[in-house]
Amino acid sequence: DEPRLKDAAKQEEVVARLLDYSEKVEGLLRNASTHAAGVVIGDRPLDELVPLYQDPRSTMVATQFSMKWVELSGLVKFDFLGLKTLTVIQNALNLLKTRNVIIDIGNISLDDQKTFELYASAKTVAVFQVESSGMMDALRRMKPTCIEDIVALVALYRPGPMENIPAYCEVKNGLKELVSIHPLIDHILAETQGIIVYQEQVMEIAQVMAGYSLGGADLLRRAMGKKIKEAMDAERPKFMKGAESNGVDEKKASEVFDLLEKFANYGFNKSHAAAYAIVSYQTAWLKANYPLEFMAGVMNCDMHLTDKLSIYKDEIINGLHLSIVPPCVNRSEVGFSVKNNELIYALTALKNVGPEAMQLIVDAREKSVSKKFSDIFEFSRLVEMKKIGKRPLEMLVRAGAFDQLNSNRSVLLKSLDSLVLYSAAIHDQRVSDQSSLFGEAGEDLLEPKLKELDSWLASEKLVEEHRAIGFYLSGHPLDDYKSSLKRNGVTTLAELRTLVKNGPVIAKVAGTISGRQDRKSARGNRFSFVQVSDPTGLFEVTLFSDVLDSSEQYLVAGENVVMSVEATSEAEQLKLLCRAAQPIDTALVDKSKKGLKVFVNSGGTISSVASLLSRVDKEKSVFGRGEVSLCLVDSGLPGEVELLVGDSFPINPQVNNALREIKGVLSVEEY
């Protein structure tokens, strides 16, 4: 139809040939691909009905025809969907069995109050189908009270029918009256608050109002859904005539037909929606009644997806107010488990750690007499550390998994080579059956001498833990700053979520940077999305070029910052725009304070204090500095002996708390 193409074809033979070839291949499939869950069934061998194709990347046979051609060839196509959620449910049920709680998930009550309270409060992190922020917002508005509400929401939450969610919620909650379309069909739409939601409703309306058979109603639905104009033109007079015979006037019948035509285009199959809703309800029921087993089941399915595990950790601690036991070679299993109403972190969830190696640790522990390792040397004797590998062992140390055996992680990390050699010697001796005459193999081998090193500071432990786990688990870098942040009017994420419900808020927030993505606008201006965490959760802040220019050097992973933000709420989702940012030690510095006084009870403690101060003096990330004085309080002396150590040492809440943890330090005071 394009005149210029016609002219080009007349002028050049090659263009004419190209257009001729193009017309022949236009509309044909460009590649062979397979549906993830599509299976075709025929009444005879498939090669007698359709051409087949062997995918070179698999052993699977596929048809060369597309979906529509397959159906026209007389084959029936089914989609057999496999859901990871079914594994989540089975994981949770298996964990419940370990404490003799046997549940037939297919026969649970469908009117459990706790489950619908969970839905209505939108506490649906990890609940199938309803964990997105949009779904959570819809749940808060709908306040579901029955399984039919969940079925309807699954069907409505798609482009097109989504616009009917507000009307459904308003009618359900009595804010709006249900509008009658026609008395003949009101009962059909009662369960969906007067809105056509399902394909089955389209068929039933055609059957009841216009006298269609079920087969005829299905043909009508298909014609409407696929917008087949010829079929629609043929169906309208048939529908009008049938409706008239049932006493429906022509105008109303035409209105209903138009309504059916509109909704049939995106009406959802009710049985499909119901199947998904039941699975959603089962996950919600498990979360409402057995939250730890459910969350452990979820986390076992996302073992190495750090971003998801971080969200689930936040949900367990801050959402469900339950506890997580950090990785521990004496308590943890290969996967996530539940004991004594606590979720035990999985050994395999650490970075660079495999399940086979962790199973060796668990097996050795269970074979021991006490069912636990007493110290790192017993671990070396019972577990062939060489088979675990140095990298996984390092991650176990960094995560604190050996803390019950030796709490000095820096010592263990530097001593791993000698421990692995010790373990190898013992196990080699066992293999060669050269054990001593009267004892176990290896008892005559001397235990290696461990390195002598200072313990990591609490802040260093968290950094190393983050390397191994992917997020902060046993604590948070801002824990030491809690009182200082409160004193300076800094708001937590949890508090900000509450404040913003009443409208936009200007506030100060503090957090540890975990990630950053830089972008450019259409005009070439820079902006960034920065991911930040505080002890109450995770959040994202948007920064535009003016703020980036002045604070970019602080916006790197691991840095603690204070931000002035403008907070708003969109569809129940917190939006933060940063107006200013600075390092936490700069933001919280108290200019009225000169420094610290460290009170100790013996001269021996002084060297430990000096060692710590020397270590933190090298920390470039600590911006506040001041004097440090040592005060020796000894009962044998008439008074305090004060010694000025220096006038420019790093001073911040993390340093203060690290000093307080030193044995022999009585107190630390600012002055």
Language-model segments: what does each one mean?
Residues 1-671:
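Noncatalytic, beta-rich nucleic-acid-contacting surfaces in large DNA/RNA-processing enzymes
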